[in-house]
Amino acid sequence: MAEQVLPQALYLSNMRKAVKIRERTPEDIFKPTNGIIHHFKTMHRYTLEMFRTCQFCPQFREIIHKALIDRNIQATLESQKKLNWCREVRKLVALKTNGDGNCLMHATSQYMWGVQDTDLVLRKALFSTLKETDTRNFKFRWQLESLKSQEFVETGLCYDTRNWNDEWDNLIKMASTDTPMARSGLQYNSLEEIHIFVLCNILRRPIIVISDKMLRSLESGSNFAPLKVGGIYLPLHWPAQECYRYPIVLGYDSHHFVPLVTLKDSGPEIRAVPLVNRDRGRFEDLKVHFLTDPENEMKEKLLKEYLMVIEIPVQGWDHGTTHLINAAKLDEANLPKEINLVDDYFELVQHEYKKWQENSEQGRREGHAQNPMEPSVPQLSLMDVKCETPNCPFFMSVNTQPLCHECSERRQKNQNKLPKLNSKPGPEGLPGMALGASRGEAYEPLAWNPEESTGGPHSAPPTAPSPFLFSETTAMKCRSPGCPFTLNVQHNGFCERCHNARQLHASHAPDHTRHLDPGKCQACLQDVTRTFNGICSTCFKRTTAEASSSLSTSLPPSCHQRSKSDPSRLVRSPSPHSCHRAGNDAPAGCLSQAARTPGDRTGTSKCRKAGCVYFGTPENKGFCTLCFIEYRENKHFAAASGKVSPTASRFQNTIPCLGRECGTLGSTMFEGYCQKCFIEAQNQRFHEAKRTEEQLRSSQRRDVPRTTQSTSRPKCARASCKNILACRSEELCMECQHPNQRMGPGAHRGEPAPEDPPKQRCRAPACDHFGNAKCNGYCNECFQFKQMYG
């Protein structure tokens, strides 16, 4: 099987290329004799980019993920909102690295070249730099960073010159490759923050480490100790013009480094990584490590010099707010063909996938021979349109539109069960593979449930990427007009802000607003990505075709468009084109599809639903079983709403541009605008976001004098009392000075005492627990940690 054949690393797909990379890497290192730091000449500019896997079926995609991706670190960083929290930028995936103590070098090497540092080229370069070159600047920055750390600030630790030298010598020994007695039983000693800083100077390329800020307890998940690894490392020993400005992005969790690489994709997301963390209702800048005091004052300038910093709009925590955050642009794949291992691995994956398909097809045929009544859905061309089942992340195909294969199979299974209720045998009891237009809309699609998706290998890939990692690599913008944010598949095509606004509006709106839902087509009542005057693009094409040509009335309706003779409209408004007559009385245009269907019976009545290939029964008022259920639902809905939707929606002047005072035609590519108005709308959104940011800053400045003025008035000294003192010379207010008067004459000792003072947070930074007076203001866990480690 492919699960055994698929290599567990990229370099195993082509050993010759891997050897060529390992030969070129040490030759590219330049070691000056004048004390300048060792560095790479050209190979530090290469970047790896992973191939897309959404074209494979979920079962085979799972095999690829198991082979290459570190899903534990991926899931941990995403759950902590440190990785892939911003939908405006591309997703990053974590590749596996060896956990032998040299994972920092393995991850860095794999990010650039696709091979791990098994030859210790990067580690030897790090050790030789610390041992042979002038490291006084590195040591000075390390001492400054250590003095600002929590261990020195809170404990009052003080080092003399001998202590500093011993610690620095220990850091140099940790970078050595000759460590038979490494700590924690690893082959090599683990590296620290200063080693990352030296490495980025050797590479002349920034390094961004994404990690949590706290080391958390494995048992309770509570904060245990602060983590300082995450942040930005700039090659400050080099001028910015001599450095490569696209950063290396690494992930860190559980003392392990992994490379975080982008995916080859043509979606609208920006190839960048945010330079902020989203935490507790605010955006916090990533820490820039090993800055001197003068450099810390010009941090923003340094970031723009060493990185390609751009501003991107993101949704704020409050509804309707937009913030501009800084992000660093990432490099695209630029490895030469002779050393590009991703292409070879992708070719190998495609080869194994063909073999896997053949084996799966053979097994499916054997299973189908044993159970011939089990239906199967053929795989045809995929469409770049989402399945219309709410919350379904898959894409529709030509033969199953407007549904994906998973939802289509589930609906067919439901159809196979329903005809059993009807005792009369007929064609409606047989499962149909290719359904007609009206037949395809017998049901509104149910909400998608991943647990109900069909199991077992399919003969061909499904219509969508997996919800695990790659479900939004082809993500589109929110379907709300004028919204600049990226959609979320869990919110049925809307972004989080628009989804919350719709939920709030739906809770206050009456039930009759269902026909006015902007996300539904008023003609076919299907959930669509965008509507044109209330109808979807498929219905619009059909109505315009009918208006332009009289011959189009004889054509069968589109597979997405509801027929004009919807059963819910037969009683209210029978039109001359309605196809509610039975048998031979039906018009030829309505029976064109039924006439081509095999199994046509003479002497029995066709279903009253236009385009339905099955036969009706007198018990169901001339409908087949499925159409009769739809007829009852629509009739009940029409009676409840009190009004009938129009039989057809038409445009009078095609699609006008949404821009003000613009007479040109709009385009779906530009969200209903023409190209000129679309560019103006984008600029307006950008300036509005910038203006909102400035207003927030100005309001914060105005609030400062008010708070200082209010805090200048003295308050009562009792912790549970918030009254203002009438006289500055007293400490207690009048109520606290005369408690008996406040309690009243009927008070006695049995009444409850005043409320206790509010609990204070633990003194340890970033700790979520409450402090304890017996533990000197710390929580029990932090107090025990402080007692153990001083």
Curated annotation (Swiss-Prot):
Zn(2+) 5 binds at C657, C662, C674, C677. Residues 92-263 form the OTU domain. Zn(2+) 7 binds at C762, C767, C779, C782. GO terms for molecular function: cysteine-type deubiquitinase activity; DNA binding; identical protein binding; K63-linked deubiquitinase activity; K63-linked polyubiquitin modification-dependent protein binding; kinase binding; protease binding; ubiquitin binding. Residues 386-453 are annotated as: Interaction with RIPK1. One of its GO terms (biological process) is negative regulation of toll-like receptor 2 signaling pathway. The active site is at D100, C103, H256. Zn(2+) 1 binds at C387, C392, C404, C407. Changing C779A: Impairs polyubiquitin binding, abolishes inhibition of IKK activation. Changing C103A: Loss of deubiquitinase activity. Ubiquitin-editing enzyme that contains both ubiquitin ligase and deubiquitinase activities. Involved in immune and inflammatory responses signaled by cytokines, such as TNF-alpha and IL-1 beta, or pathogens via Toll-like receptors (TLRs) through terminating NF-kappa-B activity. Essential component of a ubiquitin-editing protein complex, comprising also RNF11, ITCH and TAX1BP1, that ensures the transient nature of inflammatory signaling pathways. Belongs to the peptidase C64 family. The A20-type zinc fingers mediate the ubiquitin ligase activity. The A20-type zinc finger 4 selectively recognizes 'Lys-63'-linked polyubiquitin. The A20-type zinc finger 4-7 are sufficient to bind polyubiquitin. The OTU domain mediates the deubiquitinase activity. This is Tumor necrosis factor alpha-induced protein 3. It comes from Homo sapiens. The gene is TNFAIP3.
